[in-house]
Amino acid sequence: MPKTDWRSILALLTGGLIVSTGTTIPTPSIGDAVTAASARIADNLSNGPHLGFDTFAYPGDDAMRAWLTADKPYKWVGYYLSAPCHTDTTWEGKRETLSNMGWGMAVIYVGQQTWGRTPGERIAVTRYVTKRVRQTVKLKSGKRVVRYANKRVPVRVLVSPRASPGSTCSTQFVSAARGTADANDAIAKTAREGFASGTVIFLDIERMENVPKAMRDYYRAWTARVVEDGRFRPAYYAHNFNAQLIYGDVKEVLASAGVTSDPPFWIASERGFAIDKVPTDVGHAFAQVWQGLLDVVETHNGVRIPIDVNVADFPSPSAVDRNGE
């Protein structure tokens, strides 16, 4: 939560100031002091950090109303577009409802992922083949003879993996061409949901031990297409482990398109997180959102929701005017 301005609190407790000489220094009335202190506290709250949460499926209108008025001041929520690696559609059509309630939003598009593999890399699998096997058999007479028999035996072979039939999310789909196609999908769905021109779309890129060239090509192409279209702004959800590399890559793409401002980054890292910290405390100057508590369950106003907890620089991370005004 935002840090309290104790000078403001002190103003509520003092109606006048007595110095050592015994002279009373005139001060505003207690009513004026309360008004001034309240204004300063409100300023602190509006300046952030702003607490938000994300959850896989839409919790329901009643749940969102309950949480907005709860004791814990969540101000914004992750808004999942249906996407290749997040096919749930429960958030669709809820933008206006959430906006009317007063929720800020962060638009999320979960694109293709590597899932710990390298796109196009051949993998070893076990296959069974029939082989003619030479056997030596001892007869009753004691004589040994050679015979041949067909047997099923395991062998290791290298194969080029394929996406499962009907799948929309696969390591094998990670490529520049798919990055462009997924950007078009994200643009169309953001527009269909009624988000204003200039809305920030966060491309969800999950943690990778190594970032294959195909993945770098994928998110670069995604970025270039969103910029080329011009209706929305590209942004990125990334793990702290990969954030610096991704940032450098997309900055190059943006610079080549004449964009000089930093792209918004939403960084995931549990280390050192607290809800009164600001996003840059995660360790990156370009961080605008920090996700630090994952897979927790909270109950507010009697409504229980499994969530990830985030802090942001803005009360509505995807808004055109992200101060929510």
Predicted features, each with a name:
Residues 1-33:
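Secretory targeting and sorting signals
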Residues 38-59, 64-65, 70, 250-325:
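Functionally critical loop-and-helix segments that line ligand-binding/catalytic clefts
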Residues 38-218, 228:
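Substrate-binding cleft of extracellular glycoside hydrolase catalytic domains
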Residues 80-82, 234-239, 266-271:
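A generic structural motif
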Residues 115-122, 242-254:
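Glycine-rich, charge-decorated loop segments at or immediately adjacent to ligand/cofactor-binding or catalytic sites
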Residues 217, 224, 238:
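Long, charged/polar, surface-exposed segments that mediate recognition or autoinhibition
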Residues 227-248:
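Aromatic-lined carbohydrate-recognition surfaces of secreted/lumenal glycan-active proteins
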